[in-house]
Each structure stands twice: as structure tokens, then as C-alpha cells.
């Protein structure tokens, strides 16, 4: 049988039908057995599966036993992220301080920070010929695929890959944190060259520059960027670095609990983050706004904007999902602190780039969407913009291509993954093994000729 022949496709369709039918489970059984689908209870609250000191995500206050909506708060190792952002103001090394804080549980003094940055600069260099042999010789249209493949391949370049002592895991994590921006940037350059016939431009990272500065330098042919651009990207990395028990971080814990190597654990987390329900959400926001702009020509016409957004909720527009992307969050109620921070930087960047009218459009959509969603939900829970709402807009103003939107998330979040992997290993927990209840029937085996 030949692949893609008529007979091949017919059999594949038949087998697909078997899979679909066999995999169906009566949805009422999930209720009958009180299954916590998505590891959340009926109110949307996450099921407690572990303890951590790395971050705290607060979306509501509890008063007299009742959950009361409040402005969201996010803490890294006990520090409010909004306080960190104010402390980092004007700096381009906020992400480096955040790395240190997440990994070691405290903010560094000047000497500690200097040594840490010097170590990260050493780790940033990829193995000899890795760029040519691994990144450029096997280009991909998806940069998350590039990151995942490169991480697994780096296992082969490590003289001690399977040692899960804390010292070795820390060394591996610091190397990967430093190398992620370089791999993503080079992967994108290879993608442009091989799939779009553009000139291949490979710059070397420059010592003394921050992660944000080096990333902008690596993806731009002229290597130029403004102070504000570097500051904004730095803050983007800070606010994406960690966020509690999200899917990819939980994946880090699950895989690390098996005792496997760092490269396998990080590659698994990348696979989680790649999913459109997780790390790919900001891309959906950008695509939704592109569709809005093609349908609503007058951005000052709030009635037209409301009509378009109502159409989205009625599954009559864009991707017919019934969703307004970038609105609402599983934990936050009144507001997402990351969105509050990013909104302010988006406004500053829009002024520098001459895109204030577009920023005003985002503000209008945020306000109208929140009102429409709250009216439809009827739960009394406020609906606010999440971090994905403004991040895509910020990235476009920074000239970052959509192919790198989710990789930027990974460049930031690997700091959090690393901290959680180390925390899992330090506490030597049991292998994570949740229960699945069998709801099928037991059958007797029949010989093939009797089936």
C-alpha cells in the first residue's frame, strides 16, 4: 500500500472513525463521579495538588467565607510584581533580577547580581557548530518546534545530562535560560531564509547587554533598538516569567517527579506552552483584532464595535468560537496585574510609534467586551482583560513577528519552570500519579476468526 493512495486514505478514515467512536465518554459521567475536569472544581477554582513558595496568584479575597472579587495580585517569592516593576523602572535588566529571585528566593545585591549576569553571559554561547548543524540545517515553520527540538538535542552535548543533583540541574537550567533567546532568534532567521528566501542574518550576542537587548539585536538586521523598546520587552519578560500552577508549570512538576533529566522536562513544558489554549492565546488576540479592523473601518464608532463584538459572542464572526480573546481569566476577577502593567507600557510605546489611535481602539474593545461578557455571564463576576490582550499589540509595535510571540513567552517562562523543577527535586516528592476511573465494560477475548 502506498501512502496517500485512495486505499490508504479510505482505511485511515475508517480507523479515525473507530478512534472517535471508541474515545467518546458519556459527559454525564463526569458529573456523576465528581471528576475535577481541568483540575478545577465547579466554581473554576484549581484543585490543590501541591505547595510552592515561588509565586502567589490572587484573584479574589475571602471575607466571611465568601469569595469577593478584587484587583488581581501576583507575587514572586513574596514580592508584589507591581512593586518589582516600579523598582525596575528605567532598567533593562529587570528580567535578570527576576531570574535570580525565582531561582534563589531573594533579590541579589550588586556583587551577587554582577556575578550572576557574568555567568549567564558564559552560558549564552551555544555548543560549537550547534547553530549550523542543528538549527539551520533543519529549519521549521514553528519556532516552538525549533526550541523543543534544540532542547532535546542539547542533551547529547551535555557530558552529565542525567544527573539530577541540584547543582547539576541548576547549571542545566541556567544554561537553557541563557540559550533560549539565541535559539529562538536563530531559528527565526533560518525560517525566513529557507521558507521565504530572505537573506540569512546571524548576529552574535553582545556581552554587557540584557536578555531583552540581545534578543532585539539578534532578530534585527541592523541590530538597532531604542531604550524604550528594550525596557518594554524586559518588562514583558518579567511579567511572563512565572504564574503559579499553570498547565506548563504543572507539566514541569509532573515530568520532574519521575526523576527524568532536565532537557526532557523542559521539552515537555514547551509542548504544553505551544498549545493554543495556553501560550498561543496572544496570537489569537492579534488575529481577532486584524479581523475587527477589516470589518469596522471607523474605530471611533462604539456602536459598530459593540455590534462586531456581539457577533463574536454569538459565534457569527472571526473563528465562530463564541470567544472574545484576551478577556477573562481562570483566577483573576476585577483585573489582571500583568495586563495593568502592560497597558501602561503599551500606551508609552504607542506614543513613540505614532499608534495612539490603535491603542485607543484596544481600550474601547476592552471596555465594551467587559460589559458585554458580564451581562451575558450573569454571575456577578467581573470580566477583565488578561495579559494576552495587550501583549500581541506590544510585540507588533516592537517589530516582533508573530512567529516569535509564543517563543517570547517561553523565553520568559523557563525561569519559572526552572524554579519549579528545582523545588520539586528539593522536596523529593512522590511521582505524580492521579487517578482515572474506568467506565467501560469488561469483555472476553475472541479469536480473530470468530470476531
Label each region the model flagged.
Residues 1-451:
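Non-transmembrane, aqueous-exposed alpha-helical and coiled segments at domain scale
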Amino acid at each position: 500500500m502506498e501512502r496517500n493512495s485512495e486505499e490508504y486514505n479510505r482505511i485511515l478514515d475508517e480507523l479515525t472513525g473507530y478512534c472517535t467512536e471508541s474515545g467518546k465518554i458519556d459527559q454525564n459521567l463526569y458529573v456523576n463521579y465528581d471528576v475535577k475536569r481541568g483540575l478545577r472544581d465547579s466554581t473554576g477554582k484549581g484543585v490543590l495538588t501541591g505547595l510552592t513558595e515561588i509565586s502567589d496568584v490572587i484573584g479574589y479575597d475571602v471575607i466571611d467565607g465568601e469569595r469577593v472579587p478584587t484587583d488581581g495580585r501576583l507575587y514572586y517569592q513574596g514580592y508584589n510584581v507591581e512593586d518589582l516593576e516600579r523598582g525596575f523602572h528605567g532598567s533593562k535588566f529587570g528580567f535578570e533580577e527576576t531570574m535570580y529571585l525565582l531561582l534563589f528566593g531573594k533579590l541579589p545585591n550588586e556583587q551577587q547580581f554582577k556575578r550572576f549576569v557574568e555567568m549567564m553571559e558564559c552560558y549564552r554561547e551555544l555548543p560549537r557548530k550547534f547553530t549550523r548543524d542543528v538549527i539551520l540545517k533543519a529549519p521549521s515553520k514553528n519556532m516552538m518546534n525549533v526550541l523543543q527540538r534544540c532542547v532535546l538535542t542539547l542533551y547529547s552535548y551535555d557530558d552529565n545530562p542525567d544527573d539530577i543533583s541540584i547543582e547539576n540541574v541548576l547549571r542545566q537550567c541556567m544554561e537553557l535560560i541563557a540559550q533560549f533567546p539565541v535559539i529562538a532568534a536563530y531559528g527565526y532567521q533560518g525560517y525566513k531564509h529557507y521558507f521565504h528566501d530572505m537573506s540569512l542574518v546571524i548576529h552574535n550576542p553582545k556581552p554587557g547587554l540584557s536578555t531583552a537587548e540581545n534578543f532585539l539585536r539578534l532578530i534585527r538586521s541592523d541590530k538597532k533598538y531604542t531604550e524604550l523598546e528594550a525596557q518594554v520587552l524586559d518588562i514583558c519578560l518579567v511579567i511572563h516569567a512565572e504564574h503559579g500552577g499553570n498547565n506548563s508549570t504543572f507539566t514541569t512538576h509532573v515530568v520532574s517527579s519521575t526523576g527524568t533529566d532536565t532537557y526532557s522536562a523542559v521539552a515537555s513544558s514547551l509542548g504544553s506552552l505551544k498549545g493554543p489554549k495556553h501560550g498561543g492565546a496572544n496570537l489569537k488576540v492579534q488575529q481577532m483584532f486584524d479581523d475587527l479592523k477589516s470589518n469596522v473601518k471607523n474605530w471611533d464608532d462604539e456602536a459598530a464595535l459593540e455590534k462586531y463584538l456581539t457577533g463574536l459572542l454569538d459565534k457569527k464572526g472571526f473563528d465562530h468560537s463564541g470567544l472574545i480573546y484576551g478577556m477573562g481569566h481562570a483566577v483573576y476577577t476585577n483585573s489582571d496585574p500583568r495586563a495593568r502593567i502592560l497597558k501602561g507600557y503599551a500606551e508609552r510605546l504607542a506614543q513613540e510609534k505614532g499608534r495612539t489611535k490603535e491603542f485607543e481602539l484596544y481600550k474601547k474593545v476592552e471596555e465594551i467586551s467587559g460589559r458585554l461578557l458580564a451581562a451575558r455571564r450573569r454571575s456577578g463576576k467581573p470580566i477583565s482583560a488578561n495579559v494576552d490582550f495587550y501583549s500581541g499589540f506590544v510585540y507588533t509595535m516592537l517589530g516582533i513577528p508573530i512567529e516569535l510571540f509564543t517563543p517570547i513567552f517561553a523565553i520568559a517562562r523557563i525561569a519559572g519552570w526552572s524554579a519549579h523543577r528545582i523545588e520539586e527535586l528539593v522536596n523529593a516528592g512522590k511521582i505524580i500519579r492521579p487517578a482515572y476511573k474506568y467506565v467501560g465494560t469488561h469483555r472476553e477475548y475472541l479469536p480473530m476468526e470468530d470476531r
